[in-house]
From Swiss-Prot:
The porphobilinogen subunits are added to the dipyrromethane group. It comes from Moorella thermoacetica (strain ATCC 39073 / JCM 9320). One of its GO terms (cellular component) is cytoplasm. Pathway: Porphyrin-containing compound metabolism; protoporphyrin-IX biosynthesis; coproporphyrinogen-III from 5-aminolevulinate: step 2/4. Signal peptide: none annotated. InterPro entries: HemC, Porphobilin_deaminase_N, Porphobilinogen_deaminase_C, Porphobilinogen_deaminase_C_sf. Monomer. This is Porphobilinogen deaminase.
Amino acid sequence: MIEIKVGSRESELARWQARWVIQALEKAWPGLSCRLVTLKTKGDKILDVALARIGDKGLFTKELELALLDGAIDLAVHSMKDMPTTLPEGLVIGAIGPREDPADVLVSPEGYTLATLPIKARVGTSSLRRKAQLAYARPDLELVDLRGNVPTRLAKMERDGLTAIVLAAAGLKRLNHGQVLGEPIPYHICLPAVGQGAIGVEIRAGDRRVAELVAAINHPPTAAAVRAERAYLRALEGGCQVPIAALATVEDTALVLQGMVASLDGREMLRDIASGSTRDPEAAGRELARKLLARGAGEILQEVKAQSGKYQG
């Protein structure tokens, strides 16, 4: 019997994702036993400050990566949207699981859609990406910072008198909140975060035993899509807390990547598209970044970082 230690954040959604990885591994390798090890990350500890004000380098990953490098765990399970595009030396992505619905969902107890929300409705989200795209589509809305796990955010919606909140469809579905009344926001209005809806497995570089184990649960179409999105984000030198979005779709070996860059207030927005192949998904990411940079994305992001720097001191 082989035993490996699987690292995860402590949140309900993170545990769900880790359990999915454990079940998939134990099904693929009948002689394998996995033990769950949970850790609190910096992002889990600071809940009263908007993410953009904290900084985003490894906000939800660093503690797990340190445990991985120290040998306290054998692999770490992450939401791919939380992972910086550059990993610590000695660590690699060993596998990416099948993607859940990557869309954002507008949740409203009254059943409002983005189009029918009242003028100046209060909508909760802390994501700069979501705020910028919502402000572009509905500049009248009052966008309110909202942090916490899915159940916490749903509770805060009622407590804080919010008309609606925006959540990731993947989290709602994985935690069986699919019955929550919500409208998937169309991609032409709100593109998701890079890697949204995908589960990543991080391992030590050179750990052949664990690499072989996790390779069995890798989903090549999702892995190619996420690699394209991350290459795009890396080429733009963006982090999780900037108004950058992307979504790659894969059919056979063909890959199509959509991307968006916006100012914090949503007044400036650039969108474009690039095509490529699953044989070299990063090339599509770099091409899309090149196209947007040629149209002024660099200047927009420079201004975003200057404004964010004011918050972070």
